[in-house]
Amino acid sequence: MLFRSEKELLESWNEVNLYSMTRGINRFKGLVKALTEVQEKYQPVEGLETLVKWVEESDELSNPALEKAVEETGNICLKKALAWSQAVNASIKELPKEEVKPFEGVKEGIEMLHESCDIAIVSSANYEAVKEEWTRFGLIDHVDVVLAQNAGSKKSCIEKLLTYGYDKNKVMMTGDAPGDMDAADKNGVFFYPILVKKEKESWANIGEAKDRLQAGTFAGEYQDALKEKFVKNLTK
């Protein structure tokens, strides 16, 4: 029974985090979904309601913010969530370097974009992990600013970038998760999707997106078609 439960939970975890419209969800939001499923199907999770409340109300879902909440409450579920998150970061660092690499076409695409565009990383991942990976693969030289988990939500990060005077009609958010599209929509900027399991194709076509962005032909039919294809890819 335990083996079956673990298998079902892992499949559910992968569905939530990788292969559905919740792809790219913040790790703590994903954890709440998983633990809620455990509580509903298998056994009670001590202190879960406090973790749920923190995830729903915290302005920043990160390890430092969680550390502060642990100090303030001493809640067992918050403590375990922090230990888990720290273990995730440690595991990421221990991954064999050959297993962590950009998809084919990423470097060429970013280099091409940076010839005529400013590039900002807007990520919900850990800052140190993002910086290390982009540096290791020679991508950081083509980036103008790094905004990661500690900088706030993707929506707020784009909002901050727009205060530097960028024309919304010349801004494109590129990403593989619904949260990326949502952040773009809420800021009134365009969205170019990287399709899961079709990453090579997506990066090969990003040049057309750049050309349309600069020519003012991104809006309308082209943008609508990109979004439709993106949603279908995660809901089929």
Predicted regions and their residues:
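C-terminal cap/substrate-recognition subdomain and adjoining C-terminal extension
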Residues: 98-118, 126-236
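Exposed alpha-helical structural elements
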Residues: 8, 30, 50, 65, ...
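Generic hydrophobic, helix-prone segments enriched in Leu/Val/Ile
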Residues: 9-17, 70, 81-91, 156-158, ...
